[in-house]
Amino acid sequence: MLTAKYVDLAIQSAKEAFPQWSSLAVPKRAEIMFRYRTLLEQNMDAIARLITLENGKTLEEARGDIRRGFEVVEFACGISQLYKGESLAQVAQNIDGQTIREPLGVCVGISPYNFPAMVPMWMFPLAIACGNTFVLKPSEKVPLTAIRLAELFQEAGLPDGMFNIVHGGKEVVDALCSHPDVAAISFVGSSHVAKHVYTL
């Protein structure tokens, strides 16, 4: 299990990678997402078997797990359209309104053991497609699926530092949630842990 020191290294890696990634043209980020989608599709059965191995789901349940996450990646492939801002002329006399979407920075995801592919993939594909960098803390009970998802993303061309994984329990969660360089946290888990995360 990792300690707060290693959490800090992962966050620093994401922080250092953020300026390069966030300034990359949105269509270029979409290209990487499309390549990632293709690799996921090609490796879907292998990932399902990995989920079965480490989580104990039936192969059919595991396929459903990865399929639901895959749908989010497909959605993120449309980031060029999704990321567009809005403008409205003459909101008031001689005043125009404009909305611009900008990445936040280092984002964190904390996910449970029962959906080792689906829940993390609710979080990181869209965050990364939007120009953020990401640190994922999967459940320590199912570490392998997250690692494989990250490996495929790197194969798709995601540069180093954009997607980091840390493993551990409460100490790691505490370090992630209290780190001053974390801009946003996404959490799925028990109500008890959610209350703890919220108080940090």
List the predicted regions and their residue ranges.
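Rossmann-like NAD(P) dinucleotide-binding subdomain of oxidoreductase/dehydrogenase enzymes
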Residues: 85-200
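Long amphipathic alpha-helix in the N-terminal Rossmann-like dinucleotide-binding domain
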Residues: 12, 34-44, 59-83
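Short, structured beta/alpha segment
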Residues: 1-49, 53
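Residue-level signal for inorganic ion chemistry
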Residues: 14, 29, 51, 73, ...
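Short phosphate-engaging motifs
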Residues: 6, 43, 47, 69, ...
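A general structural signal for well-ordered alpha-helical segments in protein cores
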Residues: 11, 33, 69-70, 146, ...
